[in-house]
Amino acid sequence: MKKKKALPSFLYLVFIVLLPWGVSFSFNKCLELWIKNWWNTRQSETFLTDIQEKRILEGFIELEELFLLDEMIKEKPKTHVQKLPIGIHKEIIQLAKIDNEDHLHIILHFSTNIICLAILSGSFFLGKEELVILNSWVQEFFYNLNDSIKAFFILLVTDFFVGFHSTRGWELLIRWVYNNLGWAPNELIFTIFVCSFPVILDTCLKFWVFFCLNRLSPSLVVIYHSISEA
């Protein structure tokens, strides 16, 4: 009976692992043209966030300062009045094109993420039996290991997620989420998240080790603490 359910469960696991990349690749190609046509024919100021307006304004000011500096170096005040507006106008058009492409990528990534999340949620809901089988496999594999290897894997996972060097990984993760969703970067939120979330996660892991794992295998907890304190 287990062998009959092994293949569907394995295929389900492969499907779950490859789903984000498959959805991202296929829907990006399919939605890109449609979103581009929709955006170019129905632009709206509601999609222009404060950070995007600030970025365009900063780019405009930077261009103006560069043109002024260039003309001051050349020491041609007569041509400054004529060339400066023309050059800035061309650069503003280029900035508008770049900003338009940024809008398209934000909408495309957001749409793809929503579709991927919906498909993934549906897969979890429809694949409850496969998830139960996969969970039993993981538990069986873990419980069949000796206590030393179990302690090693637990220590590896805890150090990976809440270790000394994990803060950089969490910061990169939240920055990737913000960039992927098109949100304005907020250093305060990044700092609060990096300082608080690993601590909360570390507390939960310690609670699991002391209260849950200690009931299942006290010797494993002793080995775990011996390795972590070494």
From Swiss-Prot:
Keywords: Antiport, Chloroplast, Hydrogen ion transport, Ion transport, Membrane, Plastid, Plastid inner membrane, Potassium, Potassium transport, Transmembrane, Transmembrane helix, Transport. GO terms for molecular function: antiporter activity; proton transmembrane transporter activity. The chain crosses the membrane at residues 7-27, 106-126, 145-165, 181-201. InterPro entries: CemA. Signal peptide: none annotated. The keyword Amino-acid biosynthesis does not apply. It catalyses: K(+)(in) + H(+)(out) = K(+)(out) + H(+)(in). Disulfide bonds: none annotated. It is a multi-pass membrane protein. It comes from the Eukaryota. It is found in: Plastid, Chloroplast inner membrane. GO terms for biological process: potassium ion transport. Its main location: plastid. The keyword Transmembrane helix applies. One of its GO terms (cellular component) is chloroplast inner membrane. Contributes to K(+)/H(+) antiport activity by supporting proton efflux to control proton extrusion and homeostasis in chloroplasts in a light-dependent manner to modulate photosynthesis. Prevents excessive induction of non-photochemical quenching (NPQ) under continuous-light conditions. Indirectly promotes efficient inorganic carbon uptake into chloroplasts. Belongs to the CemA family. This is Potassium/proton antiporter CemA. The lineage of its organism: Eukaryota, Viridiplantae, Streptophyta, Embryophyta, Tracheophyta.
